[in-house]
């Protein structure tokens, strides 16, 4: 479920810390790398729980209106469209989500003020008002309102960002990805009774752990050989003069191209150029592109790179 660029970035950060002597040796840095991936899933589950919390507050709001001393006709028979939204019901009653939340020890206990303010923000939104006032609804509208409320109001809520930062310094940098994962969950789940599709979470995590550990370990193991390969093709540059971030990204790219036979070479090249834009110097993307393009062509010619299946695409 985590996108590969995020995983590559996590590996890059772990390798950078290793080169800087931070966090201990290779094994300890690998452990922290895997914990980082796990923490992202913790955050995903935590944010996904907000739908259930919003439904609970909406139910409470309905009961409070009925309990007024002098309730109006609307108070006594309020619209239940939001609380009965099939997608919201499914999210709030998911056993998988409850079990995963318990296992990961994440929840919203003690956050009454934050949740109340968030619900008020949702209830006052144009999207919510229009949805509740619409003469009728359908499956597309029921899904769309949750996606819109999440994208425009929950994910953008400053109180959520402050809460996440207070809980973990690691969480804040992963919040955008976690929100993307939550949005994708809502967009892909069906309206029919049943669970929300977290069944593949463990499978996804196992595949992601294998990808990051293999990429990390093989990049560490091939350091001397790959640094020499890169330095030989960097005219007028000795290995020690190449920026550490550039060298690490190129070592990772060479390792990935050599190791993962179903990832196209073009995908690998483009991914590391994109990461360089965020983590290296302004000129790095052109430098890295030039070196890797030359190196990959040679590696294909001598058989160092061998692709199968999907890896043959555009390689």
Where are these regions (language model features)?
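Class I Rossmann-like S-adenosyl-L-methionine
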Residues: 1-315
